[in-house]
């Protein structure tokens, strides 16, 4: 797809950012540099996504899953047969399985996935002062912006 066609596509990112704001930092930077509407699934449990050409779901990883607010939002609001992309921040490792199970039911096509480290002090990580300090950093943010621009 040509760059001009990509720019015309109407995109939204539905996100949840709970502990340290890692995911919010990423999606707000994307929204500043790309034409993307942001929907905070923690504050807004309903939205009409039918007019969007592509929908992103962004979350920190909690116990190897996307946040419950994202999973419930996708289950309830994602129309069938939509193009989607996924973004996650994590202390341990990326894991898309929880959201992909819902996307499969909705016959969504995943056009891309992006993940980066995010500062994490949950559970045992708190004892050592957290992991992935300083992330997402400027390079992580730039990579996320480029990821969305190239969709």
Locate each region found by the language model.
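Short, Lys/Arg-enriched N-terminal segments with co-localized hydrophobic residues
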Residues: 1-8
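FMN-binding flavodoxin-like domain, especially the glycine-rich phosphate-binding loop
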Residues: 11-12, 18, 24, 32-37, ...
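A short beta-strand-loop structural module common to alpha/beta enzyme folds
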Residues: 35-46
């Amino acid at each position: 797809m040509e760059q001009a066609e990509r720019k015309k596509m109407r995109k939204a990112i539905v996100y949840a950012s709970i502990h340290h704001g890692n995911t919010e930092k990423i999606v707000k930077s994307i929204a500043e540099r790309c034409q993307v509407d942001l929907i905070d699934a923690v504050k807004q449990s309903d939205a009409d996504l039918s007019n969007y050409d592509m929908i992103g779901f962004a979350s920190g990883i909690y116990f190897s899953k996307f946040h419950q607010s994202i999973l419930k939002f996708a289950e309830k609001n994602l129309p069938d047969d939509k193009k989607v992309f996924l973004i996650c921040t994590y202390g341990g490792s990326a894991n898309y399985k929880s959201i992909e199970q819902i996307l499969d039911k909705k016959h969504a096509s995943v056009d891309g996935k992006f993940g980066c480290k995010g500062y994490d002090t949950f559970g045992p990580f708190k004892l050592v002062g957290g992991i992935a300090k300083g992330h997402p950093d400027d390079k992580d943010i730039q990579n996320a912006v480029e990821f969305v621009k190239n969709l």
